[in-house]
Design a protein with these regions (language model features):
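Compositionally biased terminal segments of proteins
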Residues: 1-180
Length: 180
């Protein structure tokens, strides 16, 4: 059975592959959920990748083109269910749970209680995975979402996210004090 370090390495490998693919296609997206929590310093194990994507027509075309390379299918749907995952399908829906050649992918066009990509990207952060910049949801937005969803695993995440916020605030205070 893999240990937490192996799970983290596999999780970051999947994330890196998704980020590389989408970046190559110039898709506008943010990493949200458990992967964002990990990039912020949280000790979380997650087996899927959650992304919020811009729903502009050009971005939907780029996203559909990128996803075509990794054979997306609807997670939990019967294999024989006909589904063509293209820009038009993306435009008709908003949130998708997918299985791909890389792994599980949740694509969210709308994230409660905040809104769409544009609302989230206003406070987005940049983290680095394997020397590659990765844009994530902002810490305060992630806390707000976890509070809103309020599942047991989200409540567990809240403890870590609030601790990360406290550490960041303390570091900011220390940096301010050092410059006074």
């Amino acid at each position: 059975m893999p240990d937490d370090n192996e799970n983290l390495a596999q999780s970051q490998s999947r994330l890196f592959r998704f980020v590389t693919l989408l970046s190559r296609h110039k898709v506008d997206f943010l990493v949200i959920g458990g992967q964002a929590e990990i990039l912020m310093g949280g000790a979380r194990v997650t087996f899927d990748t959650d992304l919020c994507y811009d729903r502009s027509p050009h971005n939907l075309e780029r996203l559909a083109s990128a996803l075509a390379e990794i054979n997306p299918s609807l997670r939990g749907a019967p294999a024989e269910l006909p589904f063509k995952f293209d820009a038009q399908a993306l435009a008709f829906g908003s949130n998708y749970t997918l299985v791909t050649d890389i792994g599980a992918l949740d694509l969210l066009g709308w994230v409660e209680p905040i809104g769409d990509y544009n609302a989230l990207q206003a406070s987005a952060e940049t983290h680095v995975v394997r020397q590659t910049p990765v844009r994530t949801i902002g810490l305060e937005d992630l806390i707000r979402i976890k509070e809103h969803i309020n599942r047991p695993k989200d409540r567990d995440s809240l403890f870590q996210l609030i601790a990360i916020r406290a550490i960041r605030n303390e570091q900011r205070k220390k940096n301010t004090d050092d410059h006074v």
